């Protein structure tokens, strides 16, 4: 497998990134590791990074419909998911749905996330996976696995999972999938992946070969693409 890049960070859009970063830091027991006016990074207990990007014209997802659908969500492991869900609501989340061993909530910016029971996790929460919606979960999993040098570790009717270097990305099969159409403000991105590469030209060639499309924007240290499902992502150097 040819490795082009490494998953650096997943970034969620929001109109109030200080509020959103503080929410996840307090809820999950994570650390705010970097703070700029338009970008705040939170580091998990095992060193993974989640960022919050300022988007003044942010349009929140309206789960579970597909008119303005969720695009990404976080799956968080916690020991005592019901108590954690109550605490999340107290911090500004909204309870959306209950499963057998998980609760789906919306964070203060409207992004859905799942709290999933896992015995022995703590004291902070554990990031199990970033989950990305797709019309063909297996195909999108293979795209990112090849792009980031990860392995497809699960494929099933509900989705697919890739893993590598201590990180996991899940792809959720969605019927009547409605993609983002960045930079169209009527169909904006809600989140994106930053993938680090040693060489932007070589990284771009590999991404295009695998089925990505080049989008507007970029600079000396990053370029913007859409994956085969329409989700924007950045290659960074």
What are these regions (language model features)?
Residues 99-121:
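Short, structured interface segments
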Residues 117-132:
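Solvent-exposed, charged amphipathic helical/linker segments at domain boundaries
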Residues 46, 107-109, 227-229:
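Residue-level recognition of short loop/turn positions
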Residues 2-56, 83-84, 90-98, 103-104, ...:
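Core segments of cupin and vicinal oxygen chelate
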Residues 115-121, 173-175, 235-237:
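Short beta->alpha transition motifs characteristic of CBS
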Residues 11-13, 75-77, 131-133, 194-196:
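Short hydrophobic/aromatic beta-strand micro-patches
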Residues 7, 70-72, 189-191:
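Eukaryotic phosphotyrosine signaling hubs
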């Amino acid at each position: 497998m040819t490795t082009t890049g490494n998953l650096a960070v997943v970034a969620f859009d929001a109109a109030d990134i200080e509020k959103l970063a503080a929410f996840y830091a307090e809820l999950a027991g994570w650390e705010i590791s970097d703070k700029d006016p338009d970008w705040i990074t939170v580091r998990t207990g095992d060193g993974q990074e989640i960022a919050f990007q300022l988007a003044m014209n942010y349009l929140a997802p309206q789960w579970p419909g597909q008119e303005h659908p969720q695009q990404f969500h976080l799956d968080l492991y916690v020991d005592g998911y019901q108590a954690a869900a109550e605490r999340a609501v107290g911090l500004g989340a909204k309870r959306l749905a209950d499963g057998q061993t998980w609760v789906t909530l919306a964070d203060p910016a409207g992004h859905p996330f799942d709290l999933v029971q896992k015995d022995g996790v703590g004291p902070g929460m554990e990031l199990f996976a970033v989950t990305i919606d797709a019309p063909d979960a297996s195909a999108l999993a293979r795209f990112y696995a090849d792009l980031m040098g990860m392995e497809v570790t699960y494929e099933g009717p509900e989705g697919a999972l890739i893993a590598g270097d201590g990180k996991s990305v899940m792809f959720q099969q969605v019927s009547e999938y409605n993609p983002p159409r960045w930079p169209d403000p009527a169909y904006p991105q809600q989140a994106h992946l930053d993938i680090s590469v040693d060489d932007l030209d070589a990284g771009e060639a590999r991404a295009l070969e695998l089925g990505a499309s080049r989008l507007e924007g970029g600079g000396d240290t990053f370029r913007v693409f859409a994956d085969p499902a329409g989700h924007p992502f950045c290659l960074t150097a």
